[in-house]
Amino acid sequence: MGGSRSNRYAGVVVGRLGLKVAANDFARQWDDVREDALAAVDRVGGSGRLILGKEVEAFEVELAEWWGVSHAVGVASGLDALEIGLRCAGIGAGAQVLTTPLTAFATTLAILRAGAEPVWCDVDDSGGIDLDQVEAALRADSTIRAVMPVHLYGHPLDPAGLESLASEHGVVVIEDCAQSAGARRDDRPTGTAGIAAATSLYPTKNLGAMGDGGVLFSADAELAEQARRLRNYGQRARYEHGEAGLNSRLDELQAAVLRSALLPRLDRFLARRREIADRYAGALLGGPLRPIEAVAGASAHHLFPVEVVEGEPSAIAPRLEAGGIAVGRHYPVLCPDQGAVEGVGTAVGELPVARRLASRQLSLPIHPYLGDAEVGAVIEACREACA
């Protein structure tokens, strides 16, 4: 068939091999949430308050209740939430923070922005940081002050294992939950094992804003109050700045849309992600594309990652794309290999598992508006690409 015929939804066109499937579809989302989102915008516009008002306050309370934590503090990005969490925990200049090399660079960047130094430890086959290797690293180097684990792809790490690291080695644990909204393990949500946790509200996330944003979580009321000061220039009262803070405020419009249009749908979004992930996993099991699944617990399925165990990703990815399937790579360049950290930080060993996954991982489309026919098209394209 020559050319392609588009409908009104981005990423769904009839092409040479059938449906074209995009990684996300914000046009479909807008059709779903439009009425509630516009009502939220109208409410904010009529309130006369655009920054740090009742919408942010209400969203913080409602999200904390949904997530299962005591306190939530809305900020401008997930990166800022991580940095603020580190600063609230007293992690700064001269401190070492042990983290994963296989994740978005924001995790390492938050450590750098706090003035600390990253130490990267290898991951296991699920992509999550290997807690046994973390413990070995802490035993070998008692100067490490903090651990920043990432619940990568939405796969929950062991909360009891994280708590054990803190109690046995005296380190601060700050969890990166940017990808794990809705993940649970041992009947606990991610973000409850450390002194603080951070999530991202970037549009592609499980709970994504219509712009950017982030949230810091904590069970510690004093830490949460310090975070509220730090997000607003370190201001404790008008024109009184007790510490050097950031300009990092979640705005009223984003908070209103999140609490009115998106948070009420989040359980439905997560259920659909689980359905899609289960279908992919069943179809691909034992084949040349190994689903990279959680070790235990319920993944949030922010991504559906696979490891190419037969063939080469550089050959299979173009075949998938030719079949109309959007293919992601998460994350092809490890954090310690980025130019921004040249001469900075320390890797514990050669990081063989992280390097293997970085070179052989692909991400298949997964989002709550993906239709059954599109899921089938992805599966069929995977079979054809690997034939």
Q: Where are each of the predicted segments found?
A:
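N-terminal "arm"/small-domain region of PLP-dependent enzymes with the aminotransferase-like
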Residues: M1-R49, K54, P365
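PLP-dependent aminotransferase class I/II
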Residues: V12, V56-V61, V69-S70, D132, ...
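Phosphate-binding glycine-rich loop
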Residues: R49-Q96, A110-A114, W120, R188
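Conserved PLP-anchoring active-site segment centered on the Schiff-base-forming lysine
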Residues: E83-D141, A146-M148, L320
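Helix C-cap/helix->beta junction micro-motif
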Residues: A114, E168-H169, G323
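Active-site phosphate-binding strand-loop segment of PLP-dependent enzymes
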Residues: S126-A209, F217
